[in-house]
Amino acid sequence: MITKNYLIDKIHDKLNYLSKEDVKDSVDLILDYLNESLKQQKRIEIRNFGNFSIRKRKFPESEKFYNTVYYRMPKNLFKE
C-alpha cells in the first residue's frame, strides 16, 4: 500500500536536492488542492493516471442521496 509518508520518501529519494520538509509541504499542497476541488464537485484529470469526479448515489430503500468519488483509469495504464 502506498501511504502519504511512503510517497514523500520516494519523491525525496528522487529529488534529494529538496529537503524532506519541502517535499512534504508540496505533497500536502497537492493533496489539499485535489481534496478541495472534489469538494467543489470539480472534475480532476491527470493524464496517464486517470480522472476523478463526484457522483451521486442513492441510499438503498431511501430517497436520500450521497456523494462518492468516481475514478476512471486511462486505457493505456497497464499497457507495456
Swiss-Prot record:
PANTHER family: DNA-BINDING PROTEIN HU (PTHR33175), DNA-BINDING PROTEIN HU-BETA (PTHR33175:SF3)
Source species taxonomy: Bacteria, Pseudomonadati, Pseudomonadota, Alphaproteobacteria, Rickettsiales
Protein name per UniProt: DNA-binding protein HU-like
GO biological process: chromosome condensation
Described function: Histone-like DNA-binding protein which is capable of wrapping DNA to stabilize it, and thus to prevent its denaturation under extreme environmental conditions.
Entry GO MF terms: DNA binding; structural constituent of chromatin
Superkingdom, natural source: Bacteria
Gene3D superfamilies: IHF-like DNA-binding proteins (4.10.520.10)
Keywords annotated in UniProt: DNA condensation, DNA-binding
